[in-house]
Amino acid sequence: MLRAVEAGMRDHEWVPLPEIARSCGLGERKSEFRLRSLSQKKLVFLENLHYQGSQIGFNAYDLIALADLVEKGSVTGLGNRVGVGKESVVYEAVGDGPLIIKFHRQGQTSFKHVRRARDHLRDLPRGSWLYAANLAARHEFRVMERLYPAVSIPRPVACSRHALVMEQISGSLLQKVELADPGECLEMILMNMQKAFQLGIVHADLSEFNVMVAGDEIKIIDWPQAVDTTHPNAVELLKRDLHNILEFFARRYRIKTELEEALEMVRSGGDLILEHFRR
């Protein structure tokens, strides 16, 4: 029933009862009874327009995606919620080792703002919040597959609808740790930015809030807004990423690196980063 409403939302903001009944192979009366039952559980929302319309929310969409991931064998169990942001909810999970499931929530914020900010969402019709989250998850998964393992990121495992599964990583956010060797950490971040650039990707939202540090290793997380290096604003977005990182290290650790010099290092594809930090 939930999948029938989901399918209908490709063409309708509020899916008509007859279409849901046809999709389920049930009569309208039985379909209406089940929809009202799901509505009481806050899995379906009902609206009386000039027809009776139904719509699912993110709770139902989470269940559909999770069921699909279990059926495919990607996930065998769901754990605690470990993070909530403006555009995602993150849970621990179990599968082939400890995992994380990131449920995208792009449509939960201003859809107009999200569509304007994300190139892969620009052509969506108004109100397609469900598919905004779906496309954001698939975009992030494709980017991670392109980067892994050359760039130090969590290993991508699977994607279903708006749910992205990846390996669970240890460590703390760069913003929260006190680094023993901040220069080495900055070098690793720049090296990974360089590798991503060589693979045709700019993070486009990089800061101390999406770099994880564990011992002498880092992992760069949160790639839904990443752009290709052929994007007309790629260089400006790369400069913004670099500004955020360099500003953090200058403020916290008094390590000063010129933005234009760092930009040349990341774009060079050579050994300029190593030479800079070995001086």
Named regions from a protein language model:
Residues 29-30, 41, 45, 62-173, ...:
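Conserved ATP-binding subdomain of kinase catalytic cores across diverse folds
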Residues 45-46, 204:
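Short beta-strand "wing" residues that participate in macromolecule-binding interfaces
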Residues 105, 170, 208, 213, ...:
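Short, glycine/acidic-enriched loop or turn micro-motifs at the edges of active sites
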Residues 26, 198-203, 215-279:
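C-lobe/activation-segment region of protein kinase-like
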Residues 19-21, 25-28, 131-153, 175-214, ...:
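Conserved kinase catalytic-core helix
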Residues 48-65:
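Accessory beta->alpha helical hairpin/"wing" motif in late/C-terminal subdomains of nucleic-acid enzymes
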Residues 1-23:
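Short amphipathic alpha-helical interface segments
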Residues 32-36, 193:
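Short, hydrophobic-biased segments on the C-terminal half of alpha helices
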